[in-house]
């Protein structure tokens, strides 16, 4: 691997780390199990694996590395999700880990603009839509105080949570 390619990959690693930091900060702010460091490590690792598969082994099929990244992140995400009584927790955090790997992979292939746009989209989904969801539960629509219309009083309707 040439020194120029190594400098390029180094830049990609820094960019992936910074982009994934934005996603991780949002999860950290919500006091989730996987926060800043986890998201940065996942994105940086996915970027490095992707870049290495392209630059270090140019004749090989780099899609095998990409598919294995996705599989590995699936196991990591499954470890974040937990269930207590009738509620499932941290599905959104698991999904954010998954998309963080995709952001790292995009940057690792040189699709920096796609990585930046994806990060901003994820940030919008996590941050802005969270506030819309919070307001929905803050102002009930059925008059019984829970905002879900089923009368169970927990505000979640089916007893599950996606955060």
Q: Language-model segments: which ranges?
A:
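Small-residue-rich segments of transmembrane alpha-helices in multi-pass membrane proteins
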Residues: 41-51, 73-75, 95-108
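Hydrophobic transmembrane alpha-helices of secondary-active transporters
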Residues: 18-23, 75-82, 104
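Alpha-helical transmembrane segments and their membrane-interface boundaries
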Residues: 1-65, 112, 116-117, 127, ...
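Hydrophobic alpha-helical membrane segments of integral membrane proteins
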Residues: 90-95, 113-118
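Alpha-helical transmembrane-segment detector that highlights a single hydrophobic TM helix
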Residues: 59-86
């Amino acid at each position: 691997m040439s020194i120029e390619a190594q400098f390029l990959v180094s830049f990609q690693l820094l960019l992936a780390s910074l982009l994934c930091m934005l996603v991780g900060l949002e999860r950290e702010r919500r006091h989730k199990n996987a926060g800043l460091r986890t998201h940065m490590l996942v994105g940086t690792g996915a970027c490095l694996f992707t870049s290495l598969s392209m630059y270090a082994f140019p004749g090989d099929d780099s899609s095998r590395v990409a598919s294995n990244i996705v599989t590995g992140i699936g196991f990591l995400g499954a470890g974040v999700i937990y269930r207590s009584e009738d509620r499932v927790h941290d599905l959104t955090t698991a999904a954010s880990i998954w998309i963080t790997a995709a952001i790292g992979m995009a940057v690792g292939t040189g699709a920096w603009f796609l990585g930046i746009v994806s990060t901003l989209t994820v940030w919008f989904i996590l941050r802005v839509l969270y506030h819309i969801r919070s307001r929905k539960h803050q102002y009930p629509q059925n008059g019984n105080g829970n905002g879900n219309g089923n009368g169970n009083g927990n505000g979640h309707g089916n007893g599950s949570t996606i955060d």
